[in-house]
Amino acid sequence: MLVHRLNALKDNYVFVLEDEAARTAAVVDPAEARPVLEALVRLGLKLVAIFNTHHHHDHVGGNRELLEAYPGIAVYASRRDRGRIPGQTVELEDGDTVAFGCERARVIFVPGHTHGHIAYHFAGCGHLFCGDTLFAGGCGRLFEGTARQMQHSLGRLRELPGETQVWCAHEYTLGNLRFAHTLEPDNAELAERLRTVEVLRARKIATVPSTMAAERATNPFLRWESRQLQRAAGAIEPEEVFAHLRALKDRF
């Protein structure tokens, strides 16, 4: 399975998944339809499915137009987002599996950013599509869920293999790492990653995907055991550390 990263809106990423043998495609979180339709023509692919992680408009805004161009395709999303996902045909629960070509994704329920947020983990090829739950160097805001939910969700994701490719839906990495560095100035791996990302963004080069290993080493929202982060948060319990760090990031 190939993954094609498309730019959309201001800073969104949309992902077109390609089944090379069947010449079919699925799209993850189509913020808008036009870049997807153009990519399908360019790549010579037929769209067969949409995978939505949550209901926010910048993740489902292209659904209707894609359904007009490809009527009858499957639209996967959380059962908890029933009525909020345009064209949804399949309601997913934690632990469900969805197939695309020869690959299968496990659905991981990751509430926090929204009540119904899910992620798709293609273990066979090592890809995670996590929407706005886990970002490169950061995590999503708590719009509907609680800090406890989000910390638990991130804890589930950080247990995935280190080589997992983390495909998040926004280019927020530079700001996230600058914030992280204020909290852990002695984290050498974080400092090196920040320098690398500064160079990449100066050249308008994308920083997505990252890897789960890089996130575990440098993302403060996965590092609640860090003594330095515990001191910054004034807490020890993982949920409390996360909540304090998220509040600090909201004001950064």
UniProtKB/Swiss-Prot annotation:
It is an enzyme of class 3 (hydrolase). CDD domains: hydroxyacylglutathione_hydrolase_MBL-fold (cd07723). GO terms for molecular function: hydroxyacylglutathione hydrolase activity; metal ion binding. InterPro entries: Clx_II_MBL, Glyoxalase_II_hydrolase, HAGH_C, Hydroxyacylglutathione_Hdrlase, Metallo-B-lactamas, RibonucZ/Hydroxyglut_hydro. It comes from the Bacteria. SMART domains: Lactamase_B. SUPFAM superfamilies: Metallo-hydrolase/oxidoreductase. It catalyses: an S-(2-hydroxyacyl)glutathione + H2O = a 2-hydroxy carboxylate + glutathione + H(+). Keywords: Hydrolase, Metal-binding, Zinc. Zn(2+) 1 binds at H54, H56, H113, D132. Binds 2 Zn(2+) ions per subunit. Its EC number is 3.1.2.6. One of its GO terms (biological process) is methylglyoxal catabolic process to D-lactate via S-lactoyl-glutathione. Its cofactor is Zn(2+). It holds the Pfam family HAGH_C. Zn(2+) 2 binds at D58, H59, D132, H170. Pathway: Secondary metabolite metabolism; methylglyoxal degradation; (R)-lactate from methylglyoxal: step 2/2. Thiolesterase that catalyzes the hydrolysis of S-D-lactoyl-glutathione to form glutathione and D-lactic acid. Belongs to the metallo-beta-lactamase superfamily. Glyoxalase II family. Monomer. This is Hydroxyacylglutathione hydrolase. It comes from Gloeobacter violaceus (strain ATCC 29082 / PCC 7421). The gene is gloB.
